[in-house]
Regions:
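A short acidic/glycine-rich loop-to-helix N-cap element
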Residues: 6-9, 105-109, 136-145
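A short hydrophobic beta-strand element
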Residues: 90-99
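Short, low-complexity N-terminal intrinsically disordered segments enriched in polar/charged residues
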Residues: 1-36, 40, 146-160
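Short, surface-exposed coil-to-beta transition loops
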Residues: 78-79, 109-116
Length: 160
């Protein structure tokens, strides 16, 4: 759906700007501003989360509650890569990013790479899907058993 008043180029630029703002506000922990980028009925998905953990957050309240807890779980030392890619659909963007940090519960390194797809409707994010390597998370926890038995709200996309 093309946003009223914008041509395809304007919509694509708006989508790419939303993707940039999404990442920068989240990494800066400016959650009150970050959540305003979302549609009321937005969906945040983590398809690679373990089957025992929650993979979908629906609506601004759930999404904000989940993401605002991240700083208490992961210390991000650096964002080592960030690229936003336009797609054929002007209301979709792909985002690649990588972080270096550590899992606070164990002190172990958490150096993760992500690919995410952001979809926009009426100028707001209505769907975000983030893919990451679960093996990095398992290693940060100290192994599979520790990962599976850890607090189910430990890392992005690993909630129950």
């Amino acid at each position: 759906m093309i946003t009223l008043g914008l041509d395809e180029t304007g919509v694509r630029e708006q989508t790419l700007q939303l993707a940039q703002s999404y990442q920068s506000l989240l990494l800066e922990q400016r959650f009150d501003e970050w959540i305003e980028l979302w549609a009321e009925d937005g969906t945040c998905e983590f398809p690679f989360a373990h089957e025992s953990r929650r993979r979908v957050y629906q609506g601004k309240r759930e999404i904000l509650a989940y993401m605002a807890a991240t700083p208490g779980r992961i210390a991000i030392d650096a964002v080592t890569e960030m690229r936003v890619h336009p797609m054929l659909d002007p209301e979709v963007a792909a985002v690649e990013f990588a972080i270096n940090g550590r899992l606070l519960a164990t002190g172990r390194p958490y150096n993760q790479r992500y690919v995410a797809f952001l979809e926009v409707k009426d100028g707001k994010i209505w769907r975000y899907r983030e893919y990451w390597n679960p093996l990095v998370s398992m290693e940060a926890h100290g192994g599979l058993d520790e990962w599976l038995s850890a607090d189910t709200e430990t890392l992005s996309g690993e909630a129950s």
